[in-house]
UniProtKB/Swiss-Prot annotation:
Its main location: endoplasmic reticulum. Interacts with FEM1B. Residues 152-188, 344-379, 393-415 are annotated as: Disordered. Pfam families: PHTF1-2_N. This is Protein PHTF1. It comes from Bos taurus. The modification Phosphoserine is found at S272, S276, S277, S334, S336. Residues 365-376 have a biased composition (Basic and acidic residues).
């Protein structure tokens, strides 16, 4: 029905729009209908050394976002809380088994409390509805937090990703052979675990099964069987089979791919004599990684990067200079040549399958073939998440799996071009990239000052290690615990001090205490209901303030990131906090500085913590509105009700946390938007001009770039927003008028004269 309405709207829109058209608009529409397929096209490339405004704004370092609107997420969160046992598998997946059992116990206790209350409605209704509202609120917030994983397929993403990487290298087996001999002909030994055995070992050890390709120089290959976890030594496949497979595959390559492969082979043959020795294997590995990273980036973009030959030539000439000083030129043996041709053909076929992650797939297999270190695997997966977002592991697939993956991601609206452009924006950050930029930074080792070429990731890694080593305070955790205990005992304390004075408290009996604790005659159902309410209030309130403490810790870490970043250009403070130091005396240094700024701003939890803070902000506004309405209804009797006192306690505690978050957020913004750093660097440039007049032109260029950077930061930086919501201006003004009008009415009623706290800006 909705689609028919949209079609009808589009039809009528075109119908009435036809009466407004002139000849020029009709001709343009006809040209657009014909399309641009017949237009001449040239091969192009994207310059990876340039930056986009997204890099300064921070959107280049994309974070995971939900594909479902917040209204649907709220509805699903409420349903999953109300029918908690029916969604047990989902709750176990997004939390853990122990937490699920604890939450299930709280859920069952809440159901029992509701049943007992409806049987004997004697207890105050606020004591029953309070925990229920907290449970619904936190369940909805948690559903909003984990919403980025809803569209992902369930199961072990690591194993699925590695299965697709294997198919990337081997190609589609159905097009070559129907049996396992195709893998043997390719000379690639893959390790696949049986479903039962693999799941057993994954459950037992908690590690991903790795497929290892080890091509040894002594004619053997080492395979690891996932079923028994024992190495199996196999003889290398004969070279004629590899050559026959390569000859058969050459006929399937396009002319452009064949020329590209031959160009890389010609570049590689020039130094193969120097790189074939065992002692210089590291240089050969760097050459292969460099070749694949450059060609992989060009194949991802669908463009031919014409400048890669010159880049490769410079890198390979450097490697030749390093190796010719040690070794004389020797003729490459037939084994090395066959292995090089085999790897080149396998890589070309992987890029031909149309996958955006082909170069990274072979890069990972190359690293896995050198060693079985878990650190390199973890680092590679982190790079995958950085360069291609959270969808990368499920998006890298071969042609044969396209339908299967599309069915898994039927609800995903992610444009595949987004990953391509994201890679180009971040291509210069990759360590194996020829365009990776480094800055000459100063580090201190004791009292010694040393220089070191560092990249953005290395500098940010040092900053993050300093932040992680920072001793966090526990003041707000203690505040949350105190408020939790106070709210749990509040109904009992309110009845106790309301009905008993200080003299009567000295001679109070246990039966009277039990009666005051229950709020009714202490019969068995009432006692059970009171104990359940106390336990529910204690646990759920602690969980709520625990989430608030997590948000406060995250904001504190953001502030520390910004603080250490602002100290990078200060020699004294950089030495004090043991972080790298460099000046903005070159254009490349400014580029690194801007990129590091955006990178650190996007590190750590972002959307998940913003969801928590936004929920707390809206809860605070709601409680403030309710309190104002209660005061306006009767300010003399406002404090007679226990729930009004409870509202005031909640409002005071939430305001303390929000003030803390607001102060940390504003200070973080000030650190990142500190224009005085750029102005100081401009002064330093003028000082250098005075000392080195021969470099005046170069320093003037850097000074102009600094001025542009200052203007750009002022243009893009926005003030800190605590609520983290993208709110319509009309809705925002209405909400502000309603809340501030209520506060104005309360103050006017208490003080005796009219006062206005709001003013609508046009």
């Amino acid at each position: 029905m909705a689609s028919n309405e949209r079609d009808a709207i589009s039809w009528y829109q075109k119908k009435i729009g036809a009466y407004d058209q002139q000849i020029w608009e009709k001709s343009i529409e006809q040209t657009q209908i014909k399309g641009f397929k017949n237009k001449p096209k040239k091969m192009g490339h994207i310059k990876a050394d340039l930056i986009d405004v997204d890099l300064i704004r921070g959107s280049t370092f994309a974070k995971a976002k939900p594909e479902i609107p917040w209204t649907s997420l709220t509805r699903k969160g409420l349903v999953r809380v109300v029918f908690f046992p029916l969604f047990s598998s989902w709750w176990i997946q997004v939390t853990s088994l122990r937490i699920f059992v604890w939450l299930l116990l709280l859920y069952l206790m809440q159901v029992i409390a509701l049943v007992l209350y409806f049987m004997m409605p004697i207890v105050n209704v606020s004591e029953v509805l309070g925990p229920l509202c907290l449970m619904l609120l936190m369940g909805t917030v948690h559903c909003q937090i984990v919403s980025t994983q809803i569209t992902r397929p369930s199961g072990n993403n690591g194993n699925r990703r590695r299965r697709k990487l294997r198919k990337t290298v081997n190609g589609d087996g159905s097009r070559e052979n129907g049996n396992n001999s195709s893998d043997k002909a390719r000379g690639v030994e893959t390790l696949e675990s049986a479903p039962l055995n693999g799941s057993f070992w994954r459950t037992l050890f908690g590690n991903r099964m790795k497929r290892v390709k080890l091509i040894c120089n002594r004619g053997t290959e080492t395979d690891y069987d996932s079923g028994c976890l024992h190495p199996i030594i196999k003889k290398r496949q004969c070279r004629p089979e590899i050559r026959m497979w390569q000859t058969r595959e050459k006929a399937k390559f396009s002319d452009g791919e064949k020329g590209r492969r031959e160009s890389f082979r010609r570049l590689g043959n020039g130094i193969s004599d120097d790189l074939s020795s065992d002692d210089d294997g590291e240089a050969q590995t760097q050459m292969m990684i460099l070749r694949r990273s450059v060609e992989g980036a060009s194949s991802d973009n669908g463009c031919e990067i014409k400048s890669r030959k010159s880049i490769l030539s410079r890198h390979l000439n450097t490697q030749v200079k390093k190796t010719t000083s040690k070794w004389c030129s020797v003729v490459r043996d037939s084994d090395s040549l066959a292995e090089s041709e085999f790897e080149s053909a396998a890589f070309s076929q992987g890029s031909r399958s149309g996958m955006s992650g082909g170069s990274r797939s072979l890069n990972m297999l190359r690293r896995d073939s050198e060693s079985t270190r878990h650190d390199s695997e973890t680092e590679d997966m982190l790079w995958d998440d950085l360069l291609h977002g959270p969808e990368c592991r499920s998006s890298v697939t071969s042609d044969s799996e396209g339908a299967h993956v599309s069915s898994l991601h039927s609800g995903t609206k992610r444009d595949p071009k987004e990953d391509v452009f994201q890679q180009n924006h971040l291509f210069w950050l990759q360590n194996s990239s020829p365009a990776s930029d480094r800055v000459s930074a100063i580090i201190w080792e004791g009292n010694e000052c040393k220089k070191m070429d560092m990249s953005v990731l290395e500098i940010s890694g040092i900053i993050m290690s300093r932040v992680n080593a920072y001793q966090q305070g526990v003041g707000y955790q203690m505040l949350g615990n105190i408020v939790t205990i106070g709210l749990a005992f509040f109904p009992f304390l309110h009845r106790l001090f309301r009905e008993k004075n200080l003299d009567q408290l000295k001679s109070i009996s246990a039966e009277e205490i039990l009666t005051l604790f229950c709020g009714a005659p202490p019969v068995t159902p009432i006692i059970i209901l009171s104990i359940i309410n106390f336990f529910e209030r204690l646990c759920l309130t602690w969980m709520f303030f625990f989430m608030m403490c997590v948000a406060e810790r995250t904001y504190k870490q953001r502030f520390l990131f910004a603080k250490l970043f602002s100290h990078i250009t200060s020699a004294r403070k950089a030495r004090k906090y043991e972080i790298p130091h460099f000046r903005l005396k070159k254009v490349e240094n400014i580029k690194i500085w801007l990129s590091l700024r955006s990178f650190l701003k996007r590190r750590g939890p972002q959307r998940s913590v913003d969801v928590v803070v936004s929920s707390v902000f809206l809860l605070t506004l709601s409680i403030a509105f309710i309190c104002c309405a209660q005061v306006l209804r009767g300010h003399k009797t406002f404090l007679n009700d226990a729930y009004n006192w409870e509202f005031l306690i909640w409002e005071s505690a939430l305001l303390l946390f929000l003030l803390r978050l607001a102060s940390l957020g504003s200070e973080t913004n000030k650190k990142y938007s500190n224009v005085s750093i750029l102005l100081t660097e401009q002064i330093n440039l003028y000082l250098k001009m005075e000392k080195k007049p021969n470099k005046k032109e170069q320093l003037t260029l850097v000074n102009n770039v600094l001025k542009l950077s200052t203007k750009l930061l002022k243009e893009l930086d926005t003030p800190f927003r605590l609520y983290g919501l993208t709110m319509n201006p009309l809705i925002y003004n209405i909400t502000r008028v309603v809340i501030l009008s209520a506060v104005s009415g309360v103050i006017s009623d208490l003080l005796g004269f009219n006062i206005r706290l709001w003013k609508i800006k046009s």
